[in-house]
Design a protein with these regions (language model features):
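Accessory alpha-helical/coil subdomains and C-terminal extensions
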Residues: 8, 19-21, 27-61, 79-191
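Alpha-helix N-cap/helix-start and coil->helix boundary motif
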Residues: 25-26, 70
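Gly-rich Lys/Arg/Thr-decorated short loops/hinges at beta-loop-alpha junctions or inter-strand turns
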Residues: 67-77, 102-104
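Beta-hairpin (beta-strand-turn-beta-strand) motif
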Residues: 22-23, 67
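Glycine-rich nucleotide/cofactor/substrate-binding loop typically near the N-terminus or early
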Residues: 1-12, 16, 55
Length: 191
């Protein structure tokens, strides 16, 4: 892991890194930076690098940028990748809507984002989705009945399509996951 990364950086004379990623990438880069002196010493002692290579790479300099479609990093307005992900989601939902409309269907779209409902909420607003489930607003205990009532009322009012968006980390107020399969089962049994 880290020792091999340090070896490769020394062998290629790389002492500056730009890391763009999410929690795992940024944590890994921070750990590499923290352990750099010990890794370098081990590489010297085992004669895997020369003193000249060690001197050139004495300090490891990092520039880190948050790149995460989840848009869940504090102190950033928008993470690299979130806007592109939102754009792709809204395009995909727009493509689904014509089929949903022409066949009078309900489509359930599960959106990535782990425990952050940003993509689900923003895509629901952008596409005029019927319902959205997000982790930040847990669904009430009676969400299944409420969902069916809402969708039925829309059909009775002449709505030909329904789009239900669920964030992958959505839960109910008791902490139970709310998944696309759960929503499908609720609609099939309740309508």
């Amino acid at each position: 892991g880290l020792l091999k990364a340090a070896l490769n950086l020394h062998k290629f004379g790389i002492n500056k890194l730009v890391v763009i990623g999410g929690d795992g990438s940024l944590s890994g880069a921070d750990e590499l930076r923290d352990k750099w002196p010990q890794l370098q010493q081990e590489l010297l002692e085992t004669k895997q690098i020369t003193q000249q290579e060690a001197d050139f790479c004495k300090n490891l300099l990092l520039v880190v940028m948050v790149g995460s479609i989840d848009n869940d990093m504090a102190e950033t307005e928008m993470t690299i990748g979130a806007d592109t992900a939102l754009h792709r989601i809204t395009e995909s939902i727009d493509d689904l809507r014509s089929t949903a409309y022409s066949h009078q269907r309900t489509f359930i779209v599960e959106v990535m984002g782990r425990n952050c409902g940003y993509l689900a909420l923003m895509s629901a607003i952008a596409t005029g989705a019927s319902v959205v489930f997000i982790p930040e607003a847990p669904a009430r205990k009676e969400w299944r009945e409420n969902l069916c009532t809402l969708l039925d009322a829309g059909r009775n009012a002449g709505r030909r399509d329904n789009i239900v968006i669920v964030a992958e980390g959505a839960k109910d107020t008791e902490g139970n996951p709310v998944t696309a399969a759960d929503i499908k089962d609720a609609i099939q049994s309740g309508l």
